[in-house]
Structure formats: structure tokens, C-alpha cells
Amino acid sequence: MTELIYEQPLNEKIRSYLRLEYLSTQIQSNLTQDHQHRCFYPLFSLCELTDRCDYRSDVLKDIERHIIMLSKWLELPHVDKVQINELINRLIQSKAQLQTSDRIGVHLKKDKFISALRQRFGMPGACCNFDLPQLHFWLAKPWKERQIDLQCWVDQFQPLLTPINLLLELIRSTAEFCPTEAKAGFYQGDSGQPLALIRVKVDVSQGCYPTISGHRNRYAIHFVDFDQLRHTDKTIQFLLATCS
């Protein structure tokens, strides 16, 4: 049995967080295994996103909100105070690191090697050695040396990525997966409290995937048959988590 998890953000902020988390995951993979020039694609995507928007303000507000919420939980009986204090400390450390960091990615803009590659990478087939001889030279270095370079570049984004990954971890933890069924491939739900993220876990043996839409209080899930590329009329068993 193979189950896949699909996630749908219900506001633009969480959408941005998920994109940054996805790139963070790709970059971590590039740090552990040699992917040659492909390691630059998630790095440049991060540069692009952080150029467009300074996420610092939203992230700091969310960190503070979660610190206040977790601090209130400490006053409740029968809670794991050790775990809650650990989360609060992680949030405080992330907040301090983000507050004291320079604008995310600003130093990479001044890196001549990175800047030259960035200008070319958007062009089809632009990684040829006659277009980027400096890349050809860098790729010929031992993997350990390139790994150090990559880590140095990635570290410039960690003050932002670390708290975002933690915030998404906390958001996902607000709801557990519950067994649900979609009759004729459709399910609709609502919530009395604002939602941030819908998570659907479905077994691939059912031959379909969900398309999820909605806003903070209402959402709909349609299941699409992968082979027929149309809405399925079957009853689909799945697991649902609605995270706030």
C-alpha cells in the first residue's frame, strides 16, 4: 500500500511558505548528493522568490503568535510541558536569527560567479561550457569542495527557511488525519475556525488524485481519475486533515 499526501494552502502566505519549504527540501538533497549543475535551479528559485518579497515581517509575526499560543498552552493541565518549552525555545532562537540577519540572499547578488550563472540559467541549453566556462571549471572541482561552496550559499537562506519549516511543522500538527470518503468522487467541508491548510492522504491503488479548492472556512475536494483525466464517479476512501 502506497499513500500519497496532497496539500492545499488556503491563503497566499501559506502558499509562499510551502514553495519555500519545497525549495529547502530540494536544496538539502543537493547538499548530500552530487547533482552537478542541477543544484543551482532550487538555489536560483530561492533567489527569485526572496528578491520579489521580503518575508521577514510575516514570518516574525507568525513566530510571535505561536510563542504566545504555546505559552498559554503551558497553563493547561495534562500537557507535555517539556515538548512545548522545546518548541518555544526553537521559535525564540529562529526569531533572534531572523531579526539579526541581513536581507535574505543579498550577499549572493554580489557574488560574480553566481550572478553570471543566474543570467544564463533561464535560457534553454545555456549550461554548455562555451556559454559558461566558469561553471565547467567549478563542476570539475572535487565534490567535497563544491559541497562547501553550496553550503555557504544555502546558509544565507537559513535564517528564513528554518522558521518557515518550523511554522509549517506546527501548522500541520494542529490536525490529525481522519478517515473520510468522497461519494461520486466529491467531498465538501466547512469549519467554524479559519483554516490554513488542507491535507489529503490517498492510496495510489485507487487510481486517482485530488484537486482541492477553498478558502479559510469552506473547501471542496474533487478526485480525478489519472488514466481517464476526468472526474471519477467512484466512492474514494481517503484520510483528511484540516489544519489551522
Model-derived features: positions:
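Extended, charged low-complexity segments
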Residues: 194-244
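Hydrophobic/aromatic-rich structural module bridging two neighboring secondary-structure elements via a short loop
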Residues: 51-113
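Alpha-helical rod/repeat scaffolding segments in eukaryotic adaptors/tethers
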Residues: 6, 32, 36, 77-81, ...
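Generic structural signal for well-ordered, non-transmembrane alpha-helical segments
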Residues: 14, 18-21, 25, 44-51, ...
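Membrane-targeting and insertion segments and their boundary/processing signals
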Residues: 1, 33, 37, 61, ...
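Charged, well-structured binding/catalytic surfaces in domain cores that contact anionic ligands
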Residues: 94-196
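N-terminal ordered "arm"
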Residues: 2-61
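Generic recognition of cysteine residues
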Residues: 39, 47, 53, 127-128, ...
